[in-house]
Amino acid sequence: MEQCACVERELDKVLQKFLTYGQHCERSLEELLHYVGQLRAELASAALQGTPLSATLSLVMSQCCRKIKDTVQKLASDHKDIHSSVSRVGKAIDRNFDSEICGVVSDAVWDAREQQQQILQMAIVEHLYQQGMLSVAEELCQESTLNVDLDFKQPFLELNRILEALHEQDLGPALEWAVSHRQRLLELNSSLEFKLHRLHFIRLLAGGPAKQLEALSYARHFQPFARLHQREIQVMMGSLVYLRLGLEKSPYCHLLDSSHWAEICETFTRDACSLLGLSVESPLSVSFASGCVALPVLMNIKAVIEQRQCTGVWNHKDELPIEIELGMKCWYHSVFACPILRQQTSDSNPPIKLICGHVISRDALNKLINGGKLKCPYCPMEQNPADGKRIIF
């Protein structure tokens, strides 16, 4: 993070110079335009009177040309000074970040096998669909000859259609979707449908007294949600008292906050993804975010390993030389460490539950077998190794 902070400081300096230069540029050009405008008015007045160009006006015109030239040269000179600041940002990036990252990953990651290429392409396509960049995703599918089923595309197409409508403050498609999936949303304890009805009611309130009767009529949609959202419904109904005076100057002015639209987009995305079995963030974006956290740590440990000449510590297999804390946001499943070998289990070495209930790794189980029998390391029970069952957390 220190490296990012160093680059950010240089970037802030450049942005401040750009801002100052822009303001100075604007002032200089406005003054120049005003000066030229005055001179033009004097010349027009002299032309109307039919008088020849006086020596004074000729001198003023020469001064005007010189002033324009000096101003342009000064602005160009100031602009050149900014170039050095921009180049310092590039130097700060080169100084604080190592561009050579191949040493922190296994060579197999860059293997050009067709299967791995398809997995990466599919991750990119899914990310593009989830971001609403449908045409780009289709173009990538055509160029990479990747076959994507319509069943895979359909949820993303529907999600993006509804989100586009919400961004345009059109609640119709979202309400229609929520009503058609009401039962499944209730199973998820989702309040999406209520929030959509509430936002529609607030839009009617924003219409003022002319929409009062329509708002009262629409309030009937709150009846199914009265038990769970009684307090919020009471607040909305109470706001009707201030409708003629203006909600923006009432205790209910918070109802008109524009942040409700951003909130409904987030709620819809989260609940719709849960209902459709999709992740809120694409696997590609999660992997990228995790990599941004892990890469600086891995670069540091790589430098330490090379400095101490103990390269055998990191053999580029399925585990890292140190644990990297990615935060709770990146926790998707539990992790089991074998209490015998003190190693984290993996797909090739999964956790095994013994008959007695104790859990060890498969590698530990194989090492404990003696004469075709297995004695639990934690209790006196002896058992057949084949009776062990794999556990999936």
From Swiss-Prot:
Q: Which domain of life is it from?
A: Eukaryota
What molecular functions are annotated in GO for this chain?
ubiquitin protein ligase activity; zinc ion binding
Q: Where in the cell is it found?
A: Cytoplasm, Cytosol
Q: Which Pfam families match?
A: CTLH, zf-RING_UBOX
Domain LisH, first and last residues per copy: 116-148
Q: Keywords in UniProt for this one?
A: Acetylation, Cytoplasm, Metal-binding, Transferase, Ubl conjugation pathway, Zinc, Zinc-finger
One BP annotation, GO:
proteasome-mediated ubiquitin-dependent protein catabolic process
Q: Which residues carry this modification: N-acetylmethionine?
A: M1
Residues in RING-Gid-type zinc fingers run: 338-379
For this entry, the protein name equals: E3 ubiquitin-protein transferase RMND5B
Q: Name one GO cellular component term.
A: GID complex
The record's annotation in PROSITE patterns points to: CTLH, LISH, ZF_RING_GID
Does this UniProt record's set of keywords contain Metal-binding?
yes
Q: What does the subunit section of this Swiss-Prot or TrEMBL entry state?
A: Identified in the CTLH complex that contains GID4, RANBP9 and/or RANBP10, MKLN1, MAEA, RMND5A (or alternatively its paralog RMND5B), GID8, ARMC8, WDR26 and YPEL5. Within this complex, MAEA, RMND5A (or alternatively its paralog RMND5B), GID8, WDR26, and RANBP9 and/or RANBP10 form the catalytic core, while GID4, MKLN1, ARMC8 and YPEL5 have ancillary roles.
* EC numbers on record: 2.3.2.27
InterPro entries found in the cross-reference section: CRA_dom (IPR013144), CTLH/CRA (IPR024964), CTLH_C (IPR006595), Fyv10_fam (IPR045098), LisH (IPR006594), RMD5B_dRING (IPR037681), ZF_RING_GID (IPR044063), Znf-RING_euk (IPR027370)
User: Which residues pair up as cystines?
Assistant: none
Give residue ranges for domain CTLH. 155-212
Reaction catalysed by this enzyme: S-ubiquitinyl-[E2 ubiquitin-conjugating enzyme]-L-cysteine + [acceptor protein]-L-lysine = [E2 ubiquitin-conjugating enzyme]-L-cysteine + N(6)-ubiquitinyl-[acceptor protein]-L-lysine
Which organism encodes this protein?
A: Homo sapiens (Human)
Q: What does this protein do?
A: Core component of the CTLH E3 ubiquitin-protein ligase complex that selectively accepts ubiquitin from UBE2H and mediates ubiquitination and subsequent proteasomal degradation of the transcription factor HBP1. MAEA and RMND5A are both required for catalytic activity of the CTLH E3 ubiquitin-protein ligase complex. Catalytic activity of the complex is required for normal cell proliferation. The CTLH E3 ubiquitin-protein ligase complex is not required for the degradation of enzymes involved in gluconeogenesis, such as FBP1.
